[in-house]
Amino acid sequence: MPSSDRTNDECEIARIIHDSFGWALTKNRVLFESIFAKDDDFFTYYPDSKSTVVGWNQFEKFLKSWMDPRNKAIGFDIRNLRIVVSKTGEVAWFSAIVDDEGEFDGKPWGLKDVRWTGVLEKRGGSWKICQQHMSEANDEGSK
């Protein structure tokens, strides 16, 4: 894969990664649906064990609470983003640190310094997030 193609893919992937949080600022459902693979084996591990998602249908159920007018995304920050595109140019993986904040019915919610990794696949010329994993560092065990 030529380096210019790789650079273009990395820029596109970075945009998709940012849009995977940014869509919520305007509740842009069309953008949300364009980002993720609508597969039965799509999965997401969130920091809490109760929110593990397997399959697009289960993931889409989260939209109900995300689209609720009482839920308001306030902002997000993605930093230390690393993207690697495979030699074939069909698969990519990433890692980053994320902050995400909002409020539901006036009560704040959010993530701070969450580690985020994921895998994307190029399908029909478009990159889709196929899996993602978010976790909080636990440095207590290393003391």
Could you tell me what each predicted segment is?
Residues 1-38, 143:
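Short, low-complexity N-terminal intrinsically disordered segments enriched in polar/charged residues
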Residues 20, 43-47, 91-102:
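Short, well-ordered beta-strand segments in beta-rich or mixed alpha/beta enzyme
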Residues 93, 111-143:
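Short beta-strand edge/turn micro-motifs at domain boundaries
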Residues 49-51, 100-101, 136-139:
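Solvent-exposed loop/turn segments at secondary-structure junctions
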Residues 100-110:
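Short, cysteine-centered beta-strand-loop-beta hairpins and adjacent loop/turn segments enriched
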Residues 11, 29-90:
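A solvent-exposed, acidic/Ser-Thr-rich amphipathic alpha-helical stretch
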Residues 20, 59, 63, 78-84, ...:
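Hydrophobic/aromatic beta-strand elements that line small-molecule binding cavities or substrate pockets
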Residues 8, 15-16, 75-78, 115:
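Short, conserved clusters of charged catalytic residues that mark active-site
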